[in-house]
């Protein structure tokens, strides 16, 4: 049975079974939902008194989707054998399909039920990102050259001391990428995350002038740092800045005991080519989309064809 539970029950559930990602944490989820005006629900599948799986969802109207493009759908496995969890997941999604007309999920790397989603009528698209192990900060020669050049040009790196100034630079470089987003809303969101130690901005200066910034998201549960957004200055004037900022971020979080850096995307060839130079591992994840109106139209079309025959 799929049960909707409150935040207190969810917190109890993940305290027992949730050795997972940042994306199951009620504080993170609540900040995200409140800031973007989304609904938030927590679900647990039970068999008798046994809890089998659980997950949170964001929704708007009759659509399940995340307000941001970096939030993964987190599935928490509890009791039972793998077959029970598999069936529980299928039954849970079938239940959600009856309640919502559209479902859009970004699946975690190595999500185990891709075929099950396809069998449930989801269109599953494969995407890529680079994951860099922080115990080995070995890069391509090109990256090392850029870092060495930057070190010779009086650049300095530090944690941001002015969120507003740093965020403004990031926004100007990424507002096309964040199409449809409201600057005030995004500003408020990341400001709240930083106050809760879920996010941080790293700055690069030259002779006192603020040149560029990198916004990262910290998953302290899994010891993963996500290099989410970077401001991009004039590349002809500052060709080595991005390499130095990424290296600073990875070195900093290595010193904090983090294990991995997710370089956040490798789906555009120009971006993937640059990120590949940090010698990370290319990993796959999926977007899964279900739209009931689409399948209703397909069914109607098939029925018309059958009638003709």
Predicted regions and their residues:
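Conserved GNAT acetyl-CoA-binding A-motif
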Residues: 98-109, 254-264
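Conserved acyl-donor/pantetheine-binding loop and adjacent beta-alpha core of acyl/acetyltransferases
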Residues: 61-72
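Generic structural signal for hydrophobic
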Residues: 96-97, 150, 193, 253
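Aromatic (often tryptophan-rich) hydrophobic motifs at membrane interfaces
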Residues: 87-92, 191, 198-300
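A conserved beta-strand-loop-helix scaffold within acyl/acetyltransferase catalytic domains
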Residues: 2-48, 56-63, 107-129, 135-235
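A short, internal acetyl-CoA/4′-phosphopantetheine-binding micro-motif in the GNAT/acyltransferase core
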Residues: 71-83, 229-238
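Terminal substrate-recognition subdomain of acyl/acetyltransferases
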Residues: 109-153, 265-309
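A short, structural micro-pattern
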Residues: 51, 69, 99, 123-126
């Amino acid at each position: 049975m799929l049960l909707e539970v409150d935040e207190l029950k969810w917190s109890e559930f993940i305290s027992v079974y949730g050795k997972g990602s940042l994306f199951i944490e009620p504080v993170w989820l609540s900040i995200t939902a409140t800031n973007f005006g989304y609904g938030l629900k927590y679900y647990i599948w039970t068999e008798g008194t046994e809890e089998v799986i659980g997950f949170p969802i964001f929704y708007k109207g009759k659509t399940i989707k995340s307000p941001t493009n970096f939030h993964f759908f987190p599935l928490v496995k509890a009791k039972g054998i793998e077959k029970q969890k598999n069936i529980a997941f299928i039954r849970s999604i079938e239940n959600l399909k009856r309640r919502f007309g559209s479902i859009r999920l970004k699946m975690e790397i190595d999500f185990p039920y891709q075929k099950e989603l396809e069998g449930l009528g989801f269109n599953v698209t494969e995407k890529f990102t680079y994951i860099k192990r922080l115990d080995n900060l070995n890069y391509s020669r090109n990256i090392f050259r850029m870092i060495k050049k930057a070190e010779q040009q009086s650049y300095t790196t530090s944690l941001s001391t002015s969120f507003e100034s740093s965020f403004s630079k990031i926004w100007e470089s990424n507002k096309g990428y964040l199409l449809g987003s409201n600057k005030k809303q995004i500003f408020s969101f990341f400001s709240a995350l930083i106050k809760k130690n879920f996010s941080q901005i790293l700055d690069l200066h030259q002779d006192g002038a603020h040149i560029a910034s990198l916004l990262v998201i910290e998953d302290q549960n899994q010891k993963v740092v996500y290099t989410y957004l970077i401001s991009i200055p004039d590349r002809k004037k500052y060709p080595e800045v991005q390499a130095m900022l990424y290296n600073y971020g990875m070195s900093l979080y290595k010193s904090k005991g983090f294990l991995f850096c997710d370089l956040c995307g490798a789906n555009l060839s120009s971006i993937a080519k640059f990120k590949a130079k940090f010698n990370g591992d290319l990993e796959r994840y999926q977007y899964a989309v279900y739209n009931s109106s689409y399948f209703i139209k397909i069914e109607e079309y098939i029925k018309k064809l059958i009638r003709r025959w």
